[in-house]
């Protein structure tokens, strides 16, 4: 791959790297978004979000909202699997969205994109969705971070966006510097939903929490395997794990 562009947006410095078949957006030397002409999975956090969206009790949700679109990697995979689903996204960085239109074929995904602060948009929205994905991270000096407050009030605002039977997904970075937030959000999910599952890939440093009245088990993912034409994608799909989080013990 070779670097073809550098964009200094209001929120981050984005390097665009490209080869014949794929494109990467890199922020602080980490891959921030990825697109491939023939493949959809990476073994990283985007796979978790794609898989977790399919744990909706309907098995094929009719509408998905994503908070934090970036280059559209998750929507690239979801559109492949769900050609008729209504896809809506909110991202604060309009410049990276334009880069995605230019380099990652975002316009081909037939998704509605709002340029706004995601949590402010949530507070003002009256819409409801089968799946709500919270993937809001911003680039800090040395690492990514979550803006805003993650508390019961914030959880309640996200829950109001869920249609009956809907599920909420949250992408969490694991590891040093992120553990306290991970514990807090896990506890909020277990307090807020009757069913909570954790979705991971073995090579990734992230987990996706998935909460709702009903969240399907790992077996629900099997039906989607053959939708991937690449053997690499199928192998990565097979490695995704889904684990039930138990209810919190009373103090």
Language-model regions, residue ranges each:
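S-adenosyl-L-methionine
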Residues: 23-27
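Conserved S-adenosyl-L-methionine
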Residues: 193-204
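The AdoMet/dcAdoMet-binding core of the Class I SAM-like
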Residues: 6-7, 18, 40-167, 177-181, ...
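SAM/dcSAM-binding transferase cores
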Residues: 1-18, 32-39, 43, 54-55, ...
